[in-house]
Amino acid sequence: MTNFEKIIAQNKLKTNAVLATYCVIFAFIGLLVDVIRINANDLGTALFKLMTFQIFPTITIIMFLVAFVIIVVCIQNFSSIMLSGDEYKLIDKSKVLSSKENQIHRLLLELLEEAKLHFEPKLYIIKAPYMNAFASGWNESNSLIALTSALIERLDRDELKAVIAHELSHIRHNDIRLTMCVGILSNIMLLVANFSVYFFMGNRKNSGANLARMILLVLQIILPFLTLLLQMYLSRTREYMADSGAAFLMHDNKPMIRALQKISNDYANNDYKGVDQNSTRSAAYLFSAEMFSTHPSIKNRIQSLSRRVI
């Protein structure tokens, strides 16, 4: 196993730990609301009975069902959401392509062959003045990779290939699916924690229900910061994985490093704030210049790539 394969394996373990934490917090919030709903006398006993289905955890089940429905709706519309608000072009190999369009399509095919993948993501060019890229899609069959026109014009062949390899790695690692699920769980948790305390105010304030209400009040303060930290940690872990995946496919870390440096310098020398109003897409970009970005800093990404041996 190469160092790049090791870092991917290590980051998968970290991802699983974060996902498990999300699911535990999500279920715990639902169970606390159920404790308030049944007006329990003892918190511990009520939680045990709810978890063992001696008492049906109605709110908890509803929360999971709502999350499932929202995920299904997002699956149907995610790609159109990601591409909305911009002039974009599908690279359709059945039509006449420009030299640049031919080039990026050939680069994608080379990477698919190198990775022994049996699917081909749709390839889009977004007309934009900034250099960036993103991947989208719930699974391989509806996946896509989008590159901005500025990125295609300013990167050389190997750098472009590295960027496409990075986005292809996101698809291979199911990062888009993961990001979507975590975002939905976070929003539902925040909504339930913020509003559920007031839904059952008419209940008698038995000690168990009252304690559950107090815990939810504390979570109202803690959850926004906790979910932000978890999302940042998770997303940064996946970016390191995608960088490593790109270098592994390229058999060289230098093209990815050069691409990151050029993109970073482009944002440093130009003010693109407000150019892209699509916040969902902005979070998925290869590079983000925001202070509280879900992406690691370019410096850390380059350091991580530089110390890995292929």
Swiss-Prot record:
A GO CC term assigned to this protein in UniProt: plasma membrane
Binding annotation for Zn(2+): 166, 170, 239
Cellular compartment(s): Cell inner membrane
Mode of membrane association: Multi-pass membrane protein
Keyword annotations: Cell inner membrane, Cell membrane, Hydrolase, Membrane, Metal-binding, Metalloprotease, Protease, Transmembrane, Transmembrane helix, Zinc
Protein family membership: Belongs to the peptidase M48B family.
NCBIfam families: PRK02870.1
Listed name of the protein: Protease HtpX homolog
Originating species: Helicobacter pylori (strain Shi470)
Gene: htpX
